[in-house]
């Protein structure tokens, strides 16, 4: 028997990898500019929730993904700001063996999906420490957001139909 038949091809397909290396709080801010006066008003909050992601390549197959969560709450009657909470929850991930579209999906959907529970817990804790009523952010469907983004990109890059002259 020879080893020639057992030799691996020079360029063997790399196995897909997505591993968490580290999860951390990159930045956090909590402001309650109208305390304690705000507690004298009826609690009818208007909540503004913003979400964003950033990704940065740190090295070969190594990426930092940051999930930006911003919650601003004002009172319906007066418009006074109750609190503003901003959290940047980040993680370092090893990601490899993926196509470009799979990598984009991992960076904009799968990694943020792993980070969101940490950010949600931190927001809830900060709001609680401000002695406001509990705030439990609903889960986010990052896959749906990714698909919507891809649909928009596809629509924008589609050539516009030219009118035909007869």
Curated annotation (Swiss-Prot):
Q: Name one GO molecular function term.
A: unfolded protein binding
Q: What is its main location?
A: cytoplasm
Q: Which GO terms describe its biological process?
A: protein folding; protein tetramerization; protein transport
* InterPro entries, sorted: SecB, SecB-like_sf
Coiled coil region boundaries: none
* This protein's record includes keyword Nucleotidyltransferase: no
Give UniProt keywords alphabetically.
Answer: Chaperone, Cytoplasm, Protein transport, Translocation, Transport
GO CC term, one of those recorded: cytoplasm
Subcellular location field: Cytoplasm
What is this protein for, i.e. what is its function?
One of the proteins required for the normal export of preproteins out of the cell cytoplasm. It is a molecular chaperone that binds to a subset of precursor proteins, maintaining them in a translocation-competent state. It also specifically binds to its receptor SecA.
Q: How does it assemble?
A: Homotetramer, a dimer of dimers. One homotetramer interacts with 1 SecA dimer.
Name the family the entry cites.
Belongs to the SecB family.
Recorded protein name is: Protein-export protein SecB
Give the species this sequence originates from: Actinobacillus succinogenes (strain ATCC 55618 / DSM 22257 / CCUG 43843 / 130Z)
Q: Give the source lineage, highest ranks first.
A: Bacteria, Pseudomonadati, Pseudomonadota, Gammaproteobacteria, Pasteurellales
* Primary gene name: secB
């Amino acid at each position: 028997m020879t080893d020639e038949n057992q030799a691996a091809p020079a360029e063997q397909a790399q196995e897909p990898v997505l591993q968490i290396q580290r999860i951390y709080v990159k930045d956090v801010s909590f402001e309650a500019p109208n305390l304690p006066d705000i507690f004298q008003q009826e609690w009818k909050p208007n909540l503004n929730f913003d979400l964003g992601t950033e990704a940065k390549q740190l090295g070969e197959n190594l990426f930092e993904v940051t999930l930006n969560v911003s919650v601003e709450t004002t009172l319906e009657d007066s418009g006074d700001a109750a609190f503003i909470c901003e959290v940047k929850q980040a993680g370092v991930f090893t990601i490899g063996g993926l196509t470009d579209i799979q990598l984009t999906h991992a960076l904009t959907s799968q990694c943020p999906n792993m980070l969101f529970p940490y950010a949600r817990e931190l927001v809830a804790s900060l709001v609680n420490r401000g002695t406001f009523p509990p705030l439990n952010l609903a889960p986010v469907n990052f896959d749906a957001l990714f698909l919507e983004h891809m649909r928009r990109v596809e629509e924008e890059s589609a050539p516009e139909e030219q009118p035909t002259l007869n």
